Amino acid sequence: MLDVRNLHAYYGKSHILQGVDLVVREREIVSVLGRNGVGRSTTLKAIMGDVPPQGEIMFKGRPIAGLKSYEIARLGVGYVPENRDIFGALTVEQNLLLGVKAGRNTTRWSITDSYRLFPVLDERRAAAAGVLSGGEQQMLTICRTLMGDPDLIMIDEPTEGLAPQAVERIAELLLTIAQRGISILLVEQKLIIALRISHRLYVMGHGRMVFDGSPSDLRADRSIRQSWLEV
């Protein structure tokens, strides 16, 4: 599905990504863990074309490095940034409809699915998105991206700053997404969530991957957790 090889990226003269390799297969949830500032968010931005990438990025066998972000989206890559990119003045339903218009007009994920999974969005479908709680806005952002029918969705820190109940709902949503046949590349800070829902995990440090394995592999590797994850 997604194959990234020797990915480099810069902010000015700062060398942020220093040879990142990662793979996401069909129907997989793959999480990227690591401390703040190691390049996890930049990895997603480089794949999406928001940061100029150097290296090889293949999506479904096609090179996408150097394409514009809207071109990459049209090929089937969805992206949910960390800042909960909603249209606050529009209603919940209008936000979801924008996702439909931007997508490929298929039925793998519908507005009805969003409302069924998150009844609070149904209850507040006529409310301005800007008045939703942080957890509700995150749910809306993910659901709106799904309306474009991506084959792969990249999600940056979806549980950041959310209450425990909202975190659980987001975890349930991610599992449901994968069950629908959509691959997920997840940047996540909460180790317990990543271990629970991921098929594979990467740990990132100093702009490169320092671990690639299964949840059981990471649980067994105390040195990686101590060196690269624990504060």
Which sequence ranges carry the predicted segments?
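Glycine-rich phosphate-binding loops of nucleotide-dependent enzymes
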Residues: M1-V231
